[in-house]
């Protein structure tokens, strides 16, 4: 193994998806996995296969599709979890099972109610059983940040002896300071020697996740567990884009250490994850925030114009931010120019059907918008890719909401080869839209979350709506996306998109149920 190579383990599809409101359906997870592969991620933690039939389906389908990245499923130190993980990743070109058990005194006493010897016995069993499915097993000492080093060494000896190749040390509650975590990693890395790769997984409860990750790398960790945009439970995880660019930019500190991440794909990956989850990075977010390469101060602007490095320590192009587009699109632009633009923006694997549908929407948009920005095009392509599976397709929407009148929505939806029209009143315009769609489709949705943002600037900016809708008590809420200059039209599209996601998932699970054991 190259001791200077930092393995990048992305857990956006597992830990990142556990962020409130960030759930993804299988098709969305596949889109993200394909982009992560393009980004050059070494290991993709595709989910927790035993958590639900939907999770199993997502992990197994990603395992079938991805060829260059190792596909991993999380599993508790429980036989059935490990079995489901093994079955889910069995078709992967490169596969891994990531199993874990808590090792901190507080977790062992209050959560597990187990002694240290019992924890070690369970850990050995988990690794040995996982090895019957895959050769590559990772073991995590949950809450390592609050665990005792002598006991962690005992656990490490046991699981390495059982066949674990990677030992992960999670700061599960984001408690450690960089100096403390660095010292812990240094001691345990030296203890492991060449027997196993030391990994870290840092949470951001004190805002130190990336700092802790970098401290670990400087002290011997050779795998970092990260997420796109820093998504994750509570305050999130170490952000892939931050850790990777810090290692690349600060060669004076990290020396010969490197990752094989294709950094010009960082921005496209960030935008895809933000679009799918509906969770936008804060404007001043490092690397991928809207203001990351913006300079408003006159002094700063003057400096950058004279010499870029006066106020920019990395080039926007290094992470895929295109600041000066050379190809301007308008209503007279043809299909060839549109294709060139989307390739320039990094969408080189768009299907012909997705391209054609996006181009038709582009022409409609160009008739209503003076200037088409790169972000407009990016959103059109992403939206089309996410909404291609259309059981129901919105054809038309007309709303009436007079100041003293009753909000009414008239909706036309295409189902198979039939156009169905109906209208309903509601407590507000949105309520009227949702009630009409429910009447047409026969499904009653419960709105769990609703977000709307302006994609670009100006009065004619595109509105991006993200909804989370529940259609039955046994399934999670499904995410839908809508894009339009008209916010209510985008809302209707997003609601129908959530329904289509629900129906698509339901159809796939009924076909794959025989694979669940």
Curated annotation (Swiss-Prot):
Highest taxon above the source species: Bacteria
Cofactor(s) annotated in UniProt: Mn(2+)
Cysteine pairings via disulfide bonds: none
Pathway where this protein functions: Amino-acid biosynthesis; L-leucine biosynthesis; L-leucine from 3-methyl-2-oxobutanoate: step 1/4
CDD domains for the chain: DRE_TIM_IPMS
Pfam families the record matches: HCS_D2, HMGL-like, LeuA_dimer
PROSITE patterns: AIPM_HOMOCIT_SYNTH_1, AIPM_HOMOCIT_SYNTH_2, PYR_CT
Gene3D superfamilies linked: 1.10.238.260, 3.30.160.270, Aldolase class I
Gene Ontology, cellular component aspect: cytoplasm
Region (Regulatory domain): 393-517
GO BP: any one term: L-leucine biosynthetic process
Binding site for Mn(2+): 15, 201, 203, 237
Enzyme class: transferase
GO molecular function, one term: manganese ion binding
Cellular compartment(s): Cytoplasm
Keyword vocabulary terms for this entry: Amino-acid biosynthesis, Branched-chain amino acid biosynthesis, Cytoplasm, Leucine biosynthesis, Manganese, Metal-binding, Transferase
Domain Pyruvate carboxyltransferase intervals: 6-267
Keyword NAD tagged: no
Oligomer and partners: Homodimer.
Known role: Catalyzes the condensation of the acetyl group of acetyl-CoA with 3-methyl-2-oxobutanoate (2-ketoisovalerate) to form 3-carboxy-3-hydroxy-4-methylpentanoate (2-isopropylmalate).
Family according to the record: Belongs to the alpha-IPM synthase/homocitrate synthase family. LeuA type 1 subfamily.
Protein name as annotated: 2-isopropylmalate synthase
Species annotation: Aliarcobacter butzleri (strain RM4018)
Organism placement in taxonomy: Bacteria, Pseudomonadati, Campylobacterota, Epsilonproteobacteria, Campylobacterales
Gene transcribed to yield this protein: leuA
